Amino acid sequence: MPPPLRHRSMRIFVNDDRHVMAKHSAIYPTQEELEGVQNMVSHTERALKLVSDWLDDQEKGNAKVNALDTDGEGDKETEPSTGEQATRSLRGVMRVGLVAKGLLLKGDLDLELVLLCKEKPTITLLKKVSDNLAVQLKQLVTEEKYDVKPCIRDATIVIKNAKEPPLTLTIHLTSPLVREEVEKQAAGETLSVIDPPDVLDRQKCLTALASLRHAKWFQARANGLRSCVIVIRILRDLCARVPTWSPLRGWPLELLCEKAIGTGNRPMGAGEALRRVLECLASGILMADGSGICDPCEKELTDAISHVDRQQREDITQSAQHALRLSAFGQLHKVLGMDPLPSKMPRKPRSDTPIDYTVQIPPSTTYVPPMKRPIEEESTDEKNPNKKKKKLQKKSPDEKAEPAQAMNALMRLNQLKPGLQYKLISQTGPVHVPVFTMSVEVDGKNFEASGPSKRTAKLHVAVKVLQDMGLPTGMDQKTTELMKVDEPVSTQETLPPVIKMEPEPVPITETPTDENARQQGPILTKHGKNPVMELNEKRRGLKYELISETGGSHDKRFVMEVEIDGQKFQGTGSNKKVAKAYAALAALEKLFPEGSNSEVNKKKKMPPMHTGFGMVSGPPSDMMPNPRGRGRGRGRGRGRGFNNGGGFNQGGYGTYGYGGNNSGYNFYNNGGSNGGSVASNQGTNQSSGGAAATGGFGSYYQSDSSYTSPAPTPKPVGKKPPMHQNTKPQAPGVGQGGSYGQYNQGYGQKKNFGQTQGGGGAAAGGGGNFNYSTAYPSQVTGGQEYNYEGYSNQSNYNSQGGANQNFGGNSAPYNSGQAGYGRGDPNMNYQYR
């Protein structure tokens, strides 16, 4: 089984990935530079630990002297003071900035640490720590020389080394008490504690505390996000090269990248992630009327880009739009400031050890914060569980690859029971959508399962056997969560790989373990249809409502509800589309259990009210389309006319209107208006095209003239395009305007072609926000949704129809007002599903 599509870079972004990774390797620090940084940081941390011990010994010695000088009455007063001395003056040292986040680039020479103090840091403490730190560094490190200088104005200690490159390490002194005091003042409380006269600048201490929060947030949210750190490094280099981008440098850039990449519904490669960030900026998020960037590390609502003025915001937005155009037309190397790569790169030998680009410097093991020393004395292995948790957290976005684990079920069963004989029981369904049923006998017990291929059916059989034996199947443990959620028995959850289950009833009773085996396929009714589409045929105008949304960003659970005749049906899934399908499936099985194929066929056999242009002499008596006829593709030809020489509808695959002749819907001209009447088939909710516009292929530009293609000569098609999955042959003359496939149900309130009622033109005026979907499920075609979940007025990235992108709220296509850049209605979004 091939690797899961979710973790493969989209094919259209492969070139971008190559350029981004090539640029990243060029700006990434060398191993020598990283070793120099690591040595300086670790030396300083160890020296600060010795300084903390020295201060602790001094304070304990003073406490003992005070205790000896006092009498019995005074002992009661000294007990609290000795208790306070048990806590060190220096609480710990933490890495912040580029070192903590792993964002170092070539030439970055400034490193930062934060030294936490028990009390508010003072000038006296700063000088004492600085003097002793120089002594400890000389004793600790003999091969290198460090210059230590206190900077009272900035509340820091600056350390410089004498080697090349000349690194500068800044230690910021601060204390949590500084922020607590500010919060109390803001709440109107009176402060009883009087600060010492030589206390350090409060604002500098607050800034150091903020940098500490930023580092912790980044490690929790951005480090585990695929491609996020790489994109931030690329954009840091862009901010250094292009002055327009410099106001975004630092914390705002990190927030923006995490927000743009983290809201995606799947892991993305570096090229796609960079384009998503550029789209986010180009949409106007920085503009005065945009959504802005909220600082998640502040209790009060704080704008992280408040320091950027209006002109700078406009300049950055314009630059991002220009960069987005360049990347869309294959000129990403100009944005990155590099030469274009050759089309074929020589493969590097894989013997080289791969570089871990996420973690530049390993975490500190020499310095342990003093406040946690008692715990460490009890158990030295106490840190191991935390490390494991962090590793699991970092892996969590990549753990969405459940299908990769599912393929191990067959291997696992073969290891446990070698020599099993899998038998093909039956093969049903049409030639283009076969359904295989395989069986295997294990310990005298027979197991059966179905799938679109023999290999997939064998996998399903193996899953059932392992479940019956009570062994893990290799799937993720999401099934346990499914059992906890109160949902109808008929609901199942779909996982990314496209494995179609047999719609016929299986003799084995359906149990929660059966649900596990059926998890991998699309959600279909007993007729092999999308449940939402079939329910819409029976009851129109249904409204689906989102009841609840639970789980973290990597494991969402949605509950959708639909009400029919006073009865409410709920469905649960990993996204709204899946939950909606489950709700529709529950309603169908409850309200329409007697639905049969014969009824559907009767409805489909109704003759069309109007014959389209593609119908030369009406439908033939043979109801089945020619399986080997040409023009059966799904309109992938970008304007090329497919002549359906052998089919019954002479307009390409006639009812789709994709072919060279004018049949069905023709949206290439006059703004998406069909120009003819439409007959609505009440039985199947499918509209058949009337007199279509005679324009043929419309112009790419806004003009009244258009090119009308003559009937092309029969042209051999090199490859037989796949037919629709799990759909039956269409009745003659009945247009497929109702739905382009079983997976055309979009999110939200997007309308389908088939929902137009009446006879006044199915899509007159080009209105509505139509959602294009391929006939196959999205997991087969590799299509993935590419829209923003966190930004308003965000359009979808258009890969097939040209540059039909919208930035902000402008719904017009790239070049023209009403004529779309690609084929179809200009408001028709070609999006990844």
Curated annotation (Swiss-Prot):
Ranges of residues in domain DRBM: 402-471, 527-593
Biased composition (Gly residues): 640-651
Family annotation (Pfam families): dsrm (PF00035), DZF_C (PF20965), DZF_N (PF07528)
Transmembrane segments: none
A GO molecular-function descriptor: DNA binding
Ranges of biased composition (kind: Basic residues): 629-639
Entry keyword set: Antiviral defense, Cytoplasm, DNA-binding, Nucleus, Phosphoprotein, Repeat, RNA-binding, Transcription, Transcription regulation
Region (Disordered): 65-86, 339-403, 597-651, 702-762, 775-833
Subcellular location: Nucleus, Nucleolus; Cytoplasm; Nucleus
GO cellular component: cytoplasm; nucleolus
Basic and acidic residues composition bias: residue spans: 373-385
Biased composition (Polar residues): 775-818
UniProt modified residues of type Phosphothreonine: T70
Alphabetical list of SMART domains matching this protein: DSRM, DZF
Role this protein plays: RNA-binding protein that plays an essential role in the biogenesis of circular RNAs (circRNAs) which are produced by back-splicing circularization of pre-mRNAs. Within the nucleus, promotes circRNAs processing by stabilizing the regulatory elements residing in the flanking introns of the circularized exons. Plays thereby a role in the back-splicing of a subset of circRNAs. As a consequence, participates in a wide range of transcriptional and post-transcriptional processes. Binds to poly-U elements and AU-rich elements (AREs) in the 3'-UTR of target mRNAs.
Protein name: Interleukin enhancer-binding factor 3 homolog
